[in-house]
Amino acid sequence: MQYDLLIKNGYAVDYASAREGYFDVAVQNGMIAAVESSIGGSAVRELDASGKLVLPGLVDSHVHASAWLGGSYAHRMLAKAGVTSALDMSGPGTSVLELAREYGTGLNLATIEYVRPGHTVSSDDPSSAELQQLITKVQRQGSLGIKLLGGHYPLTVAATARAIRAAAELGAYTAFHAGTAAHGSNIEGLLEAVELADGNPLHLAHINAYCRGTVLPEAEETELALKALAANPNISCESYLSPLNG
């Protein structure tokens, strides 16, 4: 059989099947066709991956690839890290598209739009109607939903709850850098975010950023965060991989 691509002699890791080892990988019509210890046949293109890892493309659910955050190098950096699909976690969506046209590397890239007083909403206490209008607008423009930038541009507690609820009603994705006018980006802000979600879907960004020991010892804050997540399956999250992070 002739494949489109045959990758030979690499150390392959398949997270879905928990299989890893030295395997050949065959690709046909853009899909993995076979993973075997040795694959015969020919291919339009053959790569020797000796001494290299062969990994599935990474899905990064929190990146920045706009002119506001991330900049023109974002696409190249993601591709070099092995990312194939990503969610830009603030927008503006129009800027993400512009950079993709100019500097794109073939990523599957989705966006959500920031909720920022004086820019996308009128104040730090937008009404439900204003939030619904924003969400509908960005959905029509192609974004999946909204990002609450509580750690940088916090809304009032009530407006934060309204935003999460409005997004849920409109079927929009909501991500939240925890923090409101009442609580900062710490364990208190995290627990407040869980409460404000009120059972609605919510992506709580970089969970470990709120467990740095600013209120309680780090271990206690981490335990509180883990318990809160376990008790609220409506909330998803990711974490920083580096000990030095924003």
Question: Would you name each region that the model predicts?
Answer:
Residues 73-153:
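Divalent-metal coordination cores built from histidine and acidic residues
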Residues 128-145, 154-246:
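Histidine/acidic residue-rich metal-binding segments in metalloenzymes
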Residues 55, 99-112, 164-176:
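Alpha-helix-loop-beta-strand connector modules within alpha/beta enzyme cores
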Residues 1-41:
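N-terminal metal-binding scaffold of metallo-dependent hydrolase/deaminase domains
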Residues 14, 62, 90-91, 150, ...:
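Residues that line or immediately flank small-molecule/substrate-binding pockets and catalytic motifs
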Residues 10, 30, 51, 62, ...:
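Divalent metal-coordination and catalytic microenvironments
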Residues 58-68, 150, 174-181:
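Histidine-centered catalytic micro-motifs
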